[in-house]
Swiss-Prot record:
The lineage of its organism: Eukaryota, Metazoa, Chordata, Craniata, Vertebrata. GO terms for cellular component: extracellular region. It is found in: Secreted. Has antibacterial activity. It comes from Pan troglodytes (Chimpanzee). Keywords: Antibiotic, Antimicrobial, Defensin, Disulfide bond, Secreted, Signal. This is Beta-defensin 108B. Belongs to the beta-defensin family.
Length: 53
């Protein structure tokens, strides 16, 4: 595998310096920038929800 990209924990998220008002902060990218997910894609993420794999 080649170079490191700005990879978000969520596949449809995007890495930026700060999230827009229409986005939710969902995690961190490899370069420690926030990972932002546009609102409306899915319900608000609850930390109490167990993950199913």
């Amino acid at each position: 595998r080649g170079k490191f990209k700005e990879i978000c924990e969520r596949p449809d998220g995007s890495c930026r310096d700060f999230c827009l008002e229409t986005e939710i902060h969902v995690g961190r990218c490899l370069n420690s920038r926030p990972c932002c997910l546009p609102l409306g894609h899915q319900p608000r993420i609850e930390s109490t929800t167990p993950k199913k794999d």
